[in-house]
Amino acid sequence: MAVSPKINRREHILQCLAQMLETNPGQRITTAKLASEVGVSEAALYRHFPSKARMFEGLIEFIEESLLSRINLIMDDEKDTMKRCQLVLQLLLIFAERNPGISRVLNGDALLGENERLRSRISNLFAKIETQLKQILREKTLREGKGFNLDEAILANLLLAFAEGRIAQFVRSEFKLKPTTHFDEQWRFIQHQLLQS
């Protein structure tokens, strides 16, 4: 007799939610639709998550854990300022591209009409990433003896706005316009401009 692996129902619910966000762009996901997709009753959903907001929080926790842990690895492994910035931006874009449904959460599109604390959490995540970029840029002076002519906070904001814009285009195009398209060429241009400042 074959033993089937035990399904982690909580993870399965989150995977179905992410899949529905991808396959139903621009549409609101109801708990009734999600329960049908998962193959359980709405009551069964609520045994694992007390509310739909908690389901979205589960996705946001996955996003935070995935991105912030990888950014820490970049910080440990790479010492060059420009390479660090490139890798952080590339991480954001590749993560969004590989997780189209979740990119709607990053973009805020899937959170319209949902609990305000969800949008606040995504805003806080982007604030942490911007702070990390600012720190990377500030360390250039310490590591290389030369900083930038423009304030690092302004530059960090510009870099993050670039990544957020690419993610917004991806969501708006219903996942046709990949965030990483032309990234290498765009990064070379951005890097050249940063080094000139």
From Swiss-Prot:
Residues 30-49 bind DNA. The lineage of its organism: Bacteria, Pseudomonadati, Pseudomonadota, Gammaproteobacteria, Alteromonadales. PANTHER family: ACREF/ENVCD OPERON REPRESSOR-RELATED (PTHR43479), ACREF_ENVCD OPERON REPRESSOR-RELATED (PTHR43479:SF11). Keywords: Cell cycle, Cell division, Coiled coil, Cytoplasm, DNA-binding. Residues 7-67 form the HTH tetR-type domain. One of its GO terms (biological process) is cell division. Belongs to the nucleoid occlusion factor SlmA family. PROSITE patterns: HTH_TETR_2 (PS50977). It is found in: Cytoplasm, Nucleoid. This is Nucleoid occlusion factor SlmA. InterPro entries: Homeodomain-like_sf, HTH-type_Tx_Regulator, HTH_TetR, NO_SlmA, SlmA-like_C. Required for nucleoid occlusion (NO) phenomenon, which prevents Z-ring formation and cell division over the nucleoid. Acts as a DNA-associated cell division inhibitor that binds simultaneously chromosomal DNA and FtsZ, and disrupts the assembly of FtsZ polymers. SlmA-DNA-binding sequences (SBS) are dispersed on non-Ter regions of the chromosome, preventing FtsZ polymerization at these regions. Pfam families: SlmA-like_C, TetR_N. One of its GO terms (cellular component) is bacterial nucleoid. Residues 109-136 form a coiled coil. The gene is slmA. GO terms for molecular function: sequence-specific DNA binding. Homodimer. Interacts with FtsZ.
